[in-house]
């Protein structure tokens, strides 16, 4: 389900997983985290640290074999360090990403101007810019702050922020008018309006997020922490009651063995890895060039039930081009062509530009008339046009144009519906053109469904995720494209309020909803959705409303976001299963060591035939410690995700991480025992 660019970015991030500088920083941080305040955040590791201190006190007081006591103390201490190291290495990777972003933030001087049209120019430090200021940026200069272009267009290099080397076009009056501080203008000149306070820019927020400054536990993570705490408390009570029970059968238990039993009983593996898994989830989203504003957003993406997907750019390539002019009976093709071109001269959309291009190719002369008043397209009117010299030309959705003509007291030829249906059934978009009270004809806009998208939707369906296509097209076009793409449902002739209403309806049914948006009119729906993925190229309002921002501005990235979320949940579940399963083998190592001397029949539990009770304890504790760093790469990279049903995923993970979690420790503890015999003797 993942796209190739996402995979490539993730592989580049993984290549630096164990970079020397990252390792060194993580090692230092592991020791710095040995504070009560930090350890108490993880009940499991807090108990292990308490056991470490108690073992040290018992050994220092001269109880039992000093060598064995200090060995147990050292292994327990290293277990805590490894847990801290797992979290620290995830944080260090985040700080590495933040450092690269910080290099993009420069001490710049801005050319502040009086109005959007220019005026007197004043050079000021970028830190003095405030929302509402107008700034002029020319070729070769850096954009000093976040803002919206109000005049001009330019190609901009955003590699310092997004990692993409290809320049992007930003233009005033379009849905790609947003600029980010720290990026560089490669050509042309723009005036933009500042939208962010100093220290609150997009880059500043990115740095804070990837550094973990706003890192908070997700609801599922909190629930799992509470479960681990309850299990730890239960095992603590059980172990504390063992000496009294053993006393009834005349057995005296070594307190060091009791500490070892407790540490082996409690789920130390997942306890040590849980913080790293949460941090790594946000890092994986960042590796996919998606900025998640919280860990909760990443996690919820893995639980979504419904995806609301814009047709353009997500399901189709988003490059609708005018291909044919269809005049109605009695209308000359040149008349329709010229009217459509006039209505599109000031249209900044790709569709509008393609109409002008097609008209020119067919002989029209594109000269902007004087005293023309251009009518911009809005989601409410769903049409645009031009008023000039007594002529009123409109182009837009069929029903919107019909309503416009009928409002002037005119009737519409039945032929129009036939033309619209003919174009729509072919999967193209019909754009109706009218002048005054007369409908002139239909412009055919063609787009292509993306290759492989139908298979992706089939995978989502297998996982129980419903897909809903949102389009401004008429129902016939929407139905044709929906059938070709394989989506489960569609909303035709959609307006912003329709998106919001659909999200609320799905949520009322207990479902989690994800959607993509880039315009100001998408902001309410983005804010309402459980996962709102805003496009980096979109408006500031959209980016503020969403809980994720795609730096590549690719609407299809929502599918990759779902993959990252699923991988986050599967990784936590798989490692929790493994942690609980591998406790079984440790029971068979520790229990015979506790009771075999006094109760010979307990020796039957020594199924691994470990050499001695002390070696059994040391082998179990060593495995318990070493398994944490051994699983760090898996925790950070995530368990490999294959789209399938929840039942199939559960079966696969139980087989690999459940059964594997039982069998691997048996073999590992036996090998460690053999190594101890070879090193220390029987």
From Swiss-Prot:
<keyword id="KW-0547">Nucleotide-binding</keyword>
<keyword id="KW-1278">Translocase</keyword>
<feature type="transmembrane region" description="Helical">
    <location>
        <begin position="616"/>
        <end position="636"/>
    </location>
</feature>
<comment type="subunit">
    <text>The system is composed of three essential subunits: KdpA, KdpB and KdpC.</text>
</comment>
<dbReference type="Pfam" id="PF00702">
    <property type="entry name" value="Hydrolase"/>
</dbReference>
<keyword id="KW-0813">Transport</keyword>
<dbReference type="GO" id="GO:1903103">
    <property type="term" value="C:potassium:proton antiporter complex"/>
</dbReference>
<comment type="function">
    <text>Part of the high-affinity ATP-driven potassium transport (or Kdp) system, which catalyzes the hydrolysis of ATP coupled with the electrogenic transport of potassium into the cytoplasm. This subunit is responsible for energy coupling to the transport system and for the release of the potassium ions to the cytoplasm.</text>
</comment>
<dbReference type="GO" id="GO:0071805">
    <property type="term" value="P:potassium ion transmembrane transport"/>
</dbReference>
<dbReference type="GO" id="GO:0005886">
    <property type="term" value="C:plasma membrane"/>
</dbReference>
<dbReference type="InterPro" id="IPR006391">
    <property type="entry name" value="P-type_ATPase_bsu_IA"/>
</dbReference>
<dbReference type="InterPro" id="IPR023214">
    <property type="entry name" value="HAD_sf"/>
</dbReference>
<dbReference type="InterPro" id="IPR023299">
    <property type="entry name" value="ATPase_P-typ_cyto_dom_N"/>
</dbReference>
<keyword id="KW-0406">Ion transport</keyword>
<keyword id="KW-0597">Phosphoprotein</keyword>
<dbReference type="GO" id="GO:0005524">
    <property type="term" value="F:ATP binding"/>
</dbReference>
<dbReference type="InterPro" id="IPR018303">
    <property type="entry name" value="ATPase_P-typ_P_site"/>
</dbReference>
<feature type="active site" description="4-aspartylphosphate intermediate">
    <location>
        <position position="310"/>
    </location>
</feature>
<keyword id="KW-1133">Transmembrane helix</keyword>
<dbReference type="InterPro" id="IPR001757">
    <property type="entry name" value="P_typ_ATPase"/>
</dbReference>
<feature type="transmembrane region" description="Helical">
    <location>
        <begin position="257"/>
        <end position="277"/>
    </location>
</feature>
<keyword id="KW-0479">Metal-binding</keyword>
<feature type="transmembrane region" description="Helical">
    <location>
        <begin position="233"/>
        <end position="253"/>
    </location>
</feature>
<feature type="binding site">
    <location>
        <position position="518"/>
    </location>
    <ligand>
        <name>Mg(2+)</name>
    </ligand>
</feature>
<dbReference type="GO" id="GO:0000287">
    <property type="term" value="F:magnesium ion binding"/>
</dbReference>
<dbReference type="Pfam" id="PF00122">
    <property type="entry name" value="E1-E2_ATPase"/>
</dbReference>
<dbReference type="GO" id="GO:0008556">
    <property type="term" value="F:P-type potassium transmembrane transporter activity"/>
</dbReference>
<protein>
    <recommendedName>
        <fullName>Potassium-transporting ATPase ATP-binding subunit</fullName>
        <ecNumber>7.2.2.6</ecNumber>
    </recommendedName>
</protein>
<keyword id="KW-0630">Potassium</keyword>
<feature type="binding site">
    <location>
        <position position="395"/>
    </location>
    <ligand>
        <name>ATP</name>
    </ligand>
</feature>
<feature type="binding site">
    <location>
        <begin position="377"/>
        <end position="384"/>
    </location>
    <ligand>
        <name>ATP</name>
    </ligand>
</feature>
<dbReference type="GO" id="GO:0031004">
    <property type="term" value="C:potassium ion-transporting ATPase complex"/>
</dbReference>
<feature type="transmembrane region" description="Helical">
    <location>
        <begin position="588"/>
        <end position="608"/>
    </location>
</feature>
<feature type="binding site">
    <location>
        <position position="347"/>
    </location>
    <ligand>
        <name>ATP</name>
    </ligand>
</feature>
<keyword id="KW-0067">ATP-binding</keyword>
<feature type="binding site">
    <location>
        <position position="351"/>
    </location>
    <ligand>
        <name>ATP</name>
    </ligand>
</feature>
<feature type="binding site">
    <location>
        <position position="522"/>
    </location>
    <ligand>
        <name>Mg(2+)</name>
    </ligand>
</feature>
<keyword id="KW-1003">Cell membrane</keyword>
<dbReference type="InterPro" id="IPR023298">
    <property type="entry name" value="ATPase_P-typ_TM_dom_sf"/>
</dbReference>
<dbReference type="InterPro" id="IPR008250">
    <property type="entry name" value="ATPase_P-typ_transduc_dom_A_sf"/>
</dbReference>
<keyword id="KW-0633">Potassium transport</keyword>
<dbReference type="InterPro" id="IPR044492">
    <property type="entry name" value="P_typ_ATPase_HD_dom"/>
</dbReference>
